[in-house]
């Protein structure tokens, strides 16, 4: 955890890692500070007004396209065909998918022939298992060829940090009265059921044309909010499904939950590709559909805004300015600034500038003072000496909170935490500062992240994992993914000086080896000089690592063959726990 985060995550002792994404629930003791109700500043009132965009409703069109809006963070789309239907984006959970389909089947109860993922995010994929399990005849699962890779990374090596940061950004553990909306939807609902991701069985690289249930479909790779993003084009119906490359708010060119660099220029190019088709209907995966002249006008304004931020960031970068300077100089031109599609209810220009800079030039901004700076603790010590003692920093923190200078209060609290000074009191003041700023923020990502962080800092707060994986989800994930997770979970202090090799033989015939040396775990298929030979089923291996089974019991039952070295195997597994 970061040095300034104090969260207790309760997990059973034998859980080595947890796969579910964003399945977190909070609990607070009676001593926790009560949360104030929403403060309706003018900017927050605009966010409240934006909630009308997400009133639950199925929008139906004469061309046989139906869009479920407001049932979860993402829309789900049904396209009627001949004797069967297609689902585009499967909602954020099996629970939400079932609720949405109860409306869809009233319109047309023909079987679902295919589910198309526009990209890898859980709010578009985690409901797929509902449709997959509706009948014996399984629907085709269609996506870009890299979607499974990105799903495995989020459900694998990055899961712990992405889960926590995502839960903050979407406010998943905020009291109901604190959550206004999440900018592109009313709420994130994935915590209501086990994730229902199904691995795609039809994939493509650049373009795919096919016919399903008499529906002519074109799928086009369209880099934007994700690298695996695609858009769906139905040429006979002049209907465009752009995924997350456009919605009714300024785009998330960077997301504060954390992401790989988003190719902003590629995003513009993708929108231009969509414009070249001259669509008459636009069915985004967030916010309401559009039709008629509004479609092309909105696509044009949206791509112009993205290009403007991109181009002006590059222009000022080339003048030698740093990110903190550039963010003060870029705002949208008046010609497009008032567009309702560019309100900063999801992404912001300031965050976008920083991400564009980093995407082109990396973490070093060019300022020599920041090339190899003092540690935060050393800086805090010198600041303490400069102001006559650490207690004076604390007095300044109290004064900042008293005068509502809350951003300064947050930054001062960083120094005090680095010096481990009055942590309980500092956290209380830090919580007040975060809550104050969050209450007045109209950007839901910023608002929810700050309010969630304020809640975390309160006494007695805990995060608990409330859902685990199930066997169906684990079947979708490759064995390589599980070994990659083990590699990054290795505790280097538990590795002995001499190399140590464990060889796994699985019932599928797969052979994998983990060699511990030099504080790393090398994953290979080398089977010579094994110190430990383990035999077990592929599924059991996944289920043990996901926490569905206690390895001690499985070894004792003989389900895991350790060839007489049970204790040694359990000691080996313990090296991958923090």
PLM regions: where:
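Conserved beta-strand hairpin/beta-sheet module of binuclear metal-dependent hydrolase folds
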Residues: 55-108, 231-244
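Accessory terminal helices/loops
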Residues: 32-48, 159-166, 172-185, 189-190, ...
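Feature captures hydrophobic
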Residues: 399, 405-411, 415-418, 422, ...
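Metallo-beta-lactamase
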Residues: 85, 92-94, 152-221, 266-278, ...
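Active-site metal-binding motif and surrounding structural segment of the metallo-beta-lactamase
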Residues: 53, 83-84, 95-143, 203
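C-terminal motif of bacterial Sec signal peptides marking the signal peptidase cleavage site
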Residues: 24-27
């Amino acid at each position: 955890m970061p040095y300034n985060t104090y969260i207790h995550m309760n997990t059973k002792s034998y859980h080595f890692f947890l796969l579910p994404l964003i399945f977190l629930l909070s609990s607070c003791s009676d001593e926790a500070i009560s949360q104030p109700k929403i403060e309706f500043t003018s900017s927050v009132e605009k966010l409240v007004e934006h909630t009308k965009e997400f009133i639950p409703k199925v929008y139906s069109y004469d061309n046989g396209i139906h869009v479920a809006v407001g049932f979860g963070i993402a829309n789900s789309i049904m396209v009627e065909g001949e004797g069967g239907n297609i689902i585009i984006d499967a909602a954020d959970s099996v629970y939400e998918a079932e609720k949405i389909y109860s409306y869809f089947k009233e319109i047309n109860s023909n079987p679902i022939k295919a589910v198309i993922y526009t990209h890898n995010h859980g709010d578009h994929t985690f409901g797929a298992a509902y449709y997959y399990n509706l009948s014996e005849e399984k629907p085709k699962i269609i996506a870009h060829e890299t979607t499974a890779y990105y799903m495995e990374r989020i459900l694998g090596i990055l899961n712990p940090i992405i889960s926590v940061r995502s839960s903050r950004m979407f406010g998943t553990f905020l009291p109901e009265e604190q959550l206004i909306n999440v900018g592109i939807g009313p709420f994130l609902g994935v915590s209501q059921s086990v994730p229902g991701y199904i691995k795609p069985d039809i994939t493509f690289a650049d373009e795919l044309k096919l016919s399903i249930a008499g529906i002519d479909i074109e799928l086009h790779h369209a880099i934007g909010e994700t690298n695996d993003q695609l858009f769906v084009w139905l040429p006979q119906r002049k209907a465009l499904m752009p995924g997350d490359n456009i919605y009714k708010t300024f785009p998330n060119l960077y997301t504060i939950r954390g992401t790989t660099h988003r190719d902003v220029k590629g995003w513009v190019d993708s929108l231009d590709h969509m414009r070249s088709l001259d669509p008459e209907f636009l069915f985004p995966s967030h916010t309401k559909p559009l039709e008629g002249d509004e479609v092309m006008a909105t696509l044009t304004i949206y791509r112009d805004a993205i290009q403007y931020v991109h181009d002006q960031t590059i222009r000022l970068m080339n003048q030698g300015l740093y990110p903190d300077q550039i963010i003060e100089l870029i705002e949208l031109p008046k010609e497009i600034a008032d567009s309702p599609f560019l309100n900063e209810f999801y992404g912001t220009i300031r965050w976008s500038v920083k991400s564009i800079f980093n995407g082109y030039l990396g973490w070093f901004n060019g300022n020599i003072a920041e090339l190899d700076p003092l540690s935060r603790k050393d800086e805090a010590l010198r600041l303490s000496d400069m102001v006559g003692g650490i207690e004076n920093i604390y007095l300044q923190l109290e004064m900042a909170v008293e005068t509502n200078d809350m951003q300064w209060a947050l930054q001062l609290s960083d120094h005090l935490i680095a010096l481990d000074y009055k942590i309980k009191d500092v956290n209380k003041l830090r919580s007040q500062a975060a809550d104050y700023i969050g209450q007045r923020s109209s950007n839901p990502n910023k608002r929810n992240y700050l309010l969630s962080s304020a809640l975390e800092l309160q006494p007695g707060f805990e995060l608990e994992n409330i859902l685990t994986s199930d066997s169906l989800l684990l079947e979708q994930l490759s064995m390589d993914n599980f070994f990659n997770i083990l590699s990054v979970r290795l505790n280097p202090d538990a590795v002995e000086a001499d190399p140590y090799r464990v060889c796994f033989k699985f019932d599928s015939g797969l052979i994998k080896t983990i060699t511990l040396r030099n504080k790393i775990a090398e994953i290979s298929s080398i089977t010579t000089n094994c110190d430990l030979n383990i035999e077990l089923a592929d599924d059991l291996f996944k289920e043990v690592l996901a926490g569905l089974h206690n390895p001690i019991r499985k070894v004792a039952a003989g389900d895991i063959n350790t060839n007489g070295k049970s204790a040694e195997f359990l000691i080996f597994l313990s090296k991958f726990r923090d």
